Amino acid sequence: MKLKRLTALLLSVMLVLSLAACGGGKDAKDDSADGDLSGKEIIIGNITPVTGAQAAYGLAITNSIQLAIDEINAAGGILGATVKLSTKDDQGTPAEAVSGFNSLLSEGAAAIIGATLSSCTSAITSLADDEGIVLVTPSSTADSITTTDDYVFRSCFKDSFQGEMVAAYAKDQGWTKAAVLYATGDTYSSGLHDSFVKAAEKYGIEIVCEQSSSDTGAVDFSSQLATIAASGAGMLFAPYYYDAVGPKIIPQAREAGFKGAIMGCDGFDGTQDYTTGDLSAYENVYFTNHYSPEDSSEIVQSYVKNYTEKYGSESMNALGALAYDAMYMVKQAIEKAGSIDHEAIRDAMSGMHYVGVTGDMTLDETGTPEKSVAILTFTPSDGKLVQK
């Protein structure tokens, strides 16, 4: 079936919530401590799904890291060293994420960007801490990712933040009764379910119906959605990924007779490429996201322009922007450390203040940035993401 495009508008919600950053450490080899790595090569690892259901994320992430590296090398590298990207395909599975992590260790990576999915990153956080190598995930939003590990950071916000922002937006819109559809076996989906349900109570939103699938790869949600349609809910919170949301959940919800708002989180990014049937089904759909490509700031527009010129606009998404920021965060840390010593890089990451494509952020005790959130909506017309 031919894919259609939707346009997403940035709504007038930019909300900031304080989160937490990082500490601790282990010994790691010191390849240079004098601040000059001229003539050397710095390997940056990248663990992401190059193949599989979430390959669109991996494509944008890999492209964006390479874009950042190309810019860095053109400007003289990091401490005079040339930067090289080594990408490992985790296929969206924890076992392959572990395999990729071990391969990057053997290659002598200075730091690793990854993984993409929370389930995959969860499989390697303890390894990063044990081996003493900085791991920066651009997109794993599960709260548990950065609570205990000394060497683990992220450039994205976390699920408790997204869940609360969804509840706050629902209250602002007057949606007092909500239904939830989520995947019990997926770290991302179940974590967002938990944070939204908790926040809903805080904001006076009644959860009138909860339905679930065992994982995010389900095909038929019609039974659950029929129950939701009959529940009297004015909104449906469905924290799934774009490949389930676009061709399955949204059209099946409308076919079941659900006419209310449908909300999700950053996993909805990419839905515009996975639509099917009547595009009017995608009206009244909203999701939290990390940035808008229509933000007029110079840093955002420079990224959008450079990415589009190099790779085209079709593969660009928010996770790519987060990965671009993650690469520049690693650069900033290595330059501050004056070395590619792993512990020194970790120390330089802790408490970092960084201004990037996805916002002005500061890391604190759990390695998670304090930053703003955008809420986007779809409108059925040809075009691109535009800011309202």
Describe every region a protein language model picked out.
Residues 26-31, 56-63, 75-144, 213-221, ...:
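Beta-alpha junction/loop-to-helix N-cap segments that form part of ligand/metal-binding clefts
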Residues 177, 193-288:
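Extracellular/periplasmic bilobed ligand-binding domains
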Residues 97, 155-177, 190-192, 218-222, ...:
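Hydrophobic alpha-helical segments within soluble ligand-binding/sensing domains
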Residues 250-324, 378-379, 384-387:
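Extracellular/periplasmic periplasmic-binding protein-like sensory domains
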Residues 1-43, 74, 106, 387-388:
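Short, low-complexity disordered leader/linker segments with a strong preference
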Residues 309-317, 331-382:
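Segments of small-molecule ligand-sensing domains
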Residues 152-212, 235:
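An alpha-beta-alpha
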Residues 36-38, 42-66, 88-94, 117-119, ...:
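Extracytoplasmic "Venus flytrap"
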